[in-house]
Every structure is written in structure tokens, then in C-alpha cells.
Amino acid sequence: MELVLKDAQSALQVSETTFGREFNEALVHQVVVAYAAGARQGTRAQKTRSEVSGGGKKPWRQKGTGRARAGTIRSPIWRGGGVTFAAKPQDHSQKVNRKMYRGAIQSILSELVRQDRLVVVEKFGVDAPKTKELLTKLQALDLKDVLIVTPEVEENLFLAARNLYKVDVRDVTGIDPVSLIAFDKVLMTADAVKQIEEMLA
């Protein structure tokens, strides 16, 4: 199949496997959920009745006071006591094998092509780290909410895009399922497309 280059009167030959496969919604959902779960810190922690300091002495005798019996002032019933089912640090990451991850990326890229959300150009960059220059180039391509993917992150391009809302710059190794679907359009250079094909082959 072919991808038309936006800035040149030519087309780029790409494989059907990477850019023309059927969209697998269940797979994409599973990989995106796993990716988001892996980003969770999972460091929350609360103390149970045995971990709260104090409470070693019985507050009053068992019988004869007229009050409810109590063995410790750190019971979950008491103010300042432990938590009944205390939250503990845990690892939320989910296992996703390489084949599933590749398949999800290929599904997303193929869907981007079908929805005309993937814009391919021969080359893309800025001469100086100037936001105004980058903005002019993006406006020429009618792009506002965009992920820019290049073979390597050029410093000038990265610095120029840093202050732009809804514009991000990644290299080929930095793309992931979440970033590919988070933006309205994805702008790729021809070299980046070739590298992605090799990476997902």
C-alpha cells in the first residue's frame, strides 16, 4: 500500500501488516489499560491496628464500669485507631507480551491511516529553536493538535514545541499506544515511517 507525502508529489510504499491491518479494538483496549496501569505509582499505605503506635494498655477494666468493653485505644472503632482493611503498596503492572504490543501499535497506525489522521512528510524540522517558526510550519499543514514523530528528536524541534499546547515531539522509540491515540493528528517523516516498519516487522 501507499502513503501520500503531504509535502511532495510522491508516495511512500509501506507494508499492509503495519499500516493496513484490521482494527482490533479488544487488543488495543487491553494494551492501553495495561500501559496506564503500569504508570501507577502504587505507593499508597495505611496502618492497621497492629501498626499504629500505642494502644498496648487496656483502657479500662473489662467489667464494672458500665462502658463498652475495650482492649486497645487503637481499635478501628476508635478515633486515631488503625484502618480495618488498610491499603498497602502494590504493583499494578499487567503483563503484555511483545506480540500483543506490536499488534496494538499496528492496529492504531492502520486506524490512523483509515481516518486520515496520519500525515506523512518527506522531512520536518526547524532551523532554530523558535516556537513561531514551528507554528508557521504546522499551520501550513493545517495541524493544531498533533504528535510529531521523527527518527531522532532534534533539539531545535523539541525546544520549539515545548511551549505549544497539544503539540508533542517524540522519536520512533518514544511512541506508545496512549500517545498515538491522544492527539488529533500524527505527523511522521518518511524516515520515521520506515523505522517504525522495521521496528514492528
UniProtKB/Swiss-Prot annotation:
Q: Which UniProt keywords apply?
A: Ribonucleoprotein, Ribosomal protein, RNA-binding, rRNA-binding
A GO molecular-function annotation = structural constituent of ribosome
Some GO term, biological process aspect, for this entry: which one?
translation
Protein origin, superkingdom: Bacteria
Disordered: region residues: 43-66
- One Pfam family name is Ribosomal_L4
Query: Would I find Transferase among this entry's keywords?
Result: no
What are the GO cellular component annotations? ribonucleoprotein complex; ribosome
What function does the entry list? One of the primary rRNA binding proteins, this protein initially binds near the 5'-end of the 23S rRNA. It is important during the early stages of 50S assembly. It makes multiple contacts with different domains of the 23S rRNA in the assembled 50S subunit and ribosome. Forms part of the polypeptide exit tunnel.
Similarity comment: Belongs to the universal ribosomal protein uL4 family.
- Xref: HAMAP family: Ribosomal_uL4_B
| Assembly description | Part of the 50S ribosomal subunit.
**This protein is called what?**
Large ribosomal subunit protein uL4
Give the organism the record lists: Tolumonas auensis (strain DSM 9187 / NBRC 110442 / TA 4)
Starting at the broadest rank, the lineage of the source organism is: Bacteria, Pseudomonadati, Pseudomonadota, Gammaproteobacteria, Aeromonadales
